[in-house]
Amino acid sequence: MKETTQTFEDFKLDYDISVAADPETVLFLDIETTGFTARSSALYLIGCAYLSEGKWCTRQWFAEKYEEEKDIIESFFAFAKEGGYKTLIHFNGNQFDLPFLTQKIEALGLDLTIDDFNGIDLYKRISPLKHLLGLSSLKQKSIEKYIGIERSD
């Protein structure tokens, strides 16, 4: 398993997340998998962004082998618990990331639960506003473009 951490010295978030949760207890969560079903696909990356001592950081746990799925899950949960993180913010996580993680936890027989966290699914919150905002779609890239985030994949 490989773990990386990066601190962004000059990054400032343009949005006040304290209206939704205490910024010091928030993890922005994303996972990467080899497919869409936990039963037949591997979880190979868990990544999160968080505020630490007034600076934004990212941490990633990367499974270099299939057998390391358990390690990255346990490491993520240990980090979240030790840091006192209570809220997960994600994009469409209610439909994919959280169920996938839950199924992997169960399959691996781990004594962990995602239910200990509050959750904010940005997709679910934005979805009812699609037409009001004039969004052509609810894809993450479309929403990023709408709020002025440009990225290249």
For every predicted segment, state its role.
Residues M1-E24:
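N-terminal accessory regions of nucleic-acid-interacting proteins
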Residues T25-T34:
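Two-metal-ion RNase H-like nuclease active-site motif
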Residues T33, T37-S52, T58, A63:
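RNase H-like nuclease fold core
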Residues S41-Y44, C57, L88, N94-D153:
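Metal-dependent phosphoesterase core characteristic of DEDDh/y 3'-5' exonuclease domains
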Residues C57-A78:
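Nucleic-acid-processing active sites and adjacent nucleic-acid-binding tracks
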Residues A63, F91-N92:
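Conserved residues at beta->alpha junctions
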